[in-house]
């Protein structure tokens, strides 16, 4: 079959990347009449596993706050879509969807002015607390388990007929996706023909399409249990000054999970990204540094148990600093570069990208700010 023919009048859409944006795009394609009429075939190409990259974190925030005016409409739409998905598929049960309180805490090693700490944050070191203030209201922040979300939605779209192809994608073009099937020799190369190609491969987008400027911010993560203190549904941005009077602060974001566990996220740094996600090597001292900070932040009465440590790559655009939701000059669609906001903005990105793939005159929000003159 030629790349431009229509087998049974079906349009083949190939999506590179089985993370949250690729999954959401496929889902919203299946919601369109063209799919329900049997006019589309959708294929997701994934190298390792569903949500195997940055979408595989156990807890993440959803909010439209703390963002610039360019990307805020994307988050506003996404939050409405998350609410709809929660009602339709019982997100509270299936991906731990819940509202959360958010706090900013400033702590100091040699603190002399102790601030009041809310009852829900008694697991923090009170003696070092200089400032503790709420961010927004209870309705401004929500949380989900992105990995569970992706796995649930992947099963849902598979029921609807979306096909998953596991293998390492080597090259993409408007009408072809070249890949090596999983667990096959490197010289086992398959060139799949499609009519439209979307690359939503997170930080690995930059390897397939270097001109996009997509790179990976590496973030260390530590997972702890604190069974003797109920942590509630809380998000804490904590700034700790360990250098006396110097204005040098180390920052960590803390997310609660299952009301008895905490996830500490360190400072993102640009890191050499391997071409294969299975070959990621990291500096263990970054985990040690984050663990030292957790020891200083947690109350001495908090009985914490170390559960796990990991690193995740956040895809970011080094050209604009905002997401790319666009097509290249050669006709390849791109959705990547959301950095910290990829989980929040995924449903809106997926919906708009589905509309673009189907050639709609207008998308659900104005995506012009996310268009770039990409490629050759």
From Swiss-Prot:
Gene3D superfamilies, sorted:
D-Amino Acid Oxidase, subunit A, domain 2 (3.30.9.10), FAD/NAD(P)-binding domain (3.50.50.60)
Which Gene Ontology terms of cellular component type are present?
Answer: cytoplasm; cytosol; late endosome; membrane
Q: Which UniProt keywords apply?
A: Cytoplasm, Membrane, Oxidoreductase, Transmembrane, Transmembrane helix, Transport
Q: Sorted alphabetically, which SUPFAM superfamilies does this protein's record hold?
A: FAD/NAD(P)-binding domain
What induces the gene encoding this protein? Expression shows a peak that coincides with the meiotic divisions.
Main location class: cytoplasm
> Which N-terminal residues, if any, form the signal peptide?
none
EC number of the protein: 1.-.-.-
GO BP terms in the entry? retrograde transport, endosome to Golgi
InterPro entries found in the cross-reference section: FAD-dep_OxRdtase, FAD/NAD-bd_sf
Compartmental location: Cytoplasm; Membrane
Indicate the transmembrane segments per the record. 11-31
GO MF term set = oxidoreductase activity
UniProt topology in membrane? Single-pass membrane protein
Function (record text): Putative oxidoreductase that negatively regulates the retrieval of cargo from late endosomes to the Golgi.
Q: Spell out the family assignment given in the record's similarity comment.
A: Belongs to the TDA3 family.
In Swiss-Prot or TrEMBL terms, this protein is called Putative oxidoreductase C6G10.06
Species whose genome carries this gene: Schizosaccharomyces pombe (strain 972 / ATCC 24843) (Fission yeast)
Which lineage do the record's taxonomy fields give for this organism?
Answer: Eukaryota, Fungi, Dikarya, Ascomycota, Taphrinomycotina
């Amino acid at each position: 079959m030629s790349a431009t023919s229509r087998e049974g009048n079906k349009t083949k859409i190939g999506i590179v990347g089985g993370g949250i944006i690729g999954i959401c795009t496929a889902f919203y394609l299946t919601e369109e009449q063209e799919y329900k009429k049997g006019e589309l075939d959708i294929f997701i190409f994934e190298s390792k596993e569903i949500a195997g990259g940055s979408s595989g974190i156990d807890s993440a925030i959803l909010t439209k706050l703390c963002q610039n005016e360019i990307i805020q409409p994307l988050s506003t739409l996404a939050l409405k879509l998350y609410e709809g998905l929660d009602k339709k598929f019982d997100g509270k049960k299936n991906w731990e969807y819940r509202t959360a309180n958010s706090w900013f805490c400033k702590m100091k090693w040699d603190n002399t002015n102790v601030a009041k700490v809310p009852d829900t944050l008694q697991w923090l070191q009170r003696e070092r607390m200089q400032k503790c203030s709420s961010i927004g209201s209870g309705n401004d922040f929500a949380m989900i388990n992105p990995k569970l979300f992706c796995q649930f939605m992947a099963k849902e779209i598979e029921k609807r007929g979306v096909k998953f192809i596991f293998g390492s994608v080597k090259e993409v073009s408007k009408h072809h996706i070249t890949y090596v099937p999983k667990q096959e020799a490197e010289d086992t190369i398959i060139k799949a023909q499609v009519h439209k190609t979307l690359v939503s491969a997170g930080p690995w987008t930059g390897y397939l399409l270097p001109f996009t400027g997509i790179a990976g911010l590496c973030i260390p993560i530590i997972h702890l249990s604190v069974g003797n203190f109920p942590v509630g549904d809380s998000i804490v941005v904590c700034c700790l000054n360990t250098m006396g009077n110097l204005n040098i602060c180390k920052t960590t974001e803390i997310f609660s999970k299952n009301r008895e566990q905490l996830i500490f996220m360190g400072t993102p740094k640009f890191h050499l990204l391997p071409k294969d996600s299975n070959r990621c090597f990291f500096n263990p001292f970054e985990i040690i540094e984050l663990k030292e900070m957790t020891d200083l932040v947690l109350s001495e009465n908090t009985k914490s148990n170390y559960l796990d440590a990991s690193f995740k790559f956040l895809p970011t655009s080094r050209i604009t600093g905002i997401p790319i939701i666009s097509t290249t000059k050669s006709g390849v669609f791109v959705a990547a570069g959301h950095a910290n906001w990829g989980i929040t903005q995924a449903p809106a990105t997926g919906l708009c990208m589905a509309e673009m793939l189907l050639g709609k005159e207008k998308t659900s929000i104005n995506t012009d700010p996310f268009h770039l003159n990409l490629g050759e």
